């Protein structure tokens, strides 16, 4: 899931080397903390949050077999 998120985000942003994903996992959930360059935050969020909502949907679908709750957070 971490790799999936990184690949999707790197294809959306203009400064790819600033993409960083940190994975925190416990018994019931997985938290993926995403950080990008400040210039690219708008591209990740999208108009009315459509892009980040789509990213979260794809990551959750990819994690379906883990039976864990997946959260994607954008860090500033």
PLM regions: where:
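RNA-contacting regions in translation and RNA-metabolism proteins
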Residues: 1-43, 57-76
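Ordered, soluble secondary-structure elements with a strong preference for glycine-centered loop motifs
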Residues: 42-53
